[in-house]
């Protein structure tokens, strides 16, 4: 059903970024403002990690913590050229809802693939 698709065909291009020193309170405001469930932690040049809604729930009672203190480092990433089937397998095996799409040329996140995006594709293909 999805064998002809690559990650780049379904991913959302671009990501919302915060810096290492961003306070959790500001991360929460950013996530609410853009209605998203995760952000990338970057210094503009280097990708350091991600903060998901689960990370926020774990640390909600300490709003002064920084992104660096609560981020998930070394999250699983995938190439935009990867087969979508492989990305789905990774997400199912690891129990994750987001896969960040990393440029094959540089240490930069170029998009995100979420379980919502995949479910939407499944729905479109069923119709």
Swiss-Prot record:
Alphabetized PROSITE patterns for the sequence: CBS
UniProtKB keywords: CBS domain, Repeat
Matching SUPFAM superfamilies: CBS-domain pair
Signal peptide residue numbers: none
Protein name per its UniProtKB record: Uncharacterized protein MJ0868
Database matches in Pfam families: CBS (PF00571)
SMART domains assigned to the protein according to its UniProt record, in alphabetical order: CBS
Domain CBS: start-end pairs: 11-68, 71-127
Superkingdom in the source lineage: Archaea
Organism name: Methanocaldococcus jannaschii (strain ATCC 43067 / DSM 2661 / JAL-1 / JCM 10045 / NBRC 100440) (Methanococcus jannaschii)
């Amino acid at each position: 059903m999805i064998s002809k698709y690559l990650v780049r065909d379904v991913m959302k291009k671009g990501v919302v970024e915060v810096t290492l020193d961003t306070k959790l309170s500001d991360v929460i405001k950013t996530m609410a403002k853009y209605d998203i469930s995760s952000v990338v932690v970057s210094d503009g040049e280097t990708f350091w990690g991600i903060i998901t809604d689960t990370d926020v729930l774990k640390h909600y009672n300490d709003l002064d913590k920084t992104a660096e203190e609560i981020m998930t480092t070394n999250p699983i990433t995938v190439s935009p050229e990867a087969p979508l089937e492989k990305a789905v397998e990774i997400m199912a095996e690891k129990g994750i809802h987001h896969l960040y799409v990393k440029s094959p040329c540089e240490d930069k996140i170029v998009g995100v693939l979420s379980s919502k995006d995949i479910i939407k594709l499944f729905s479109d293909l069923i119709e």
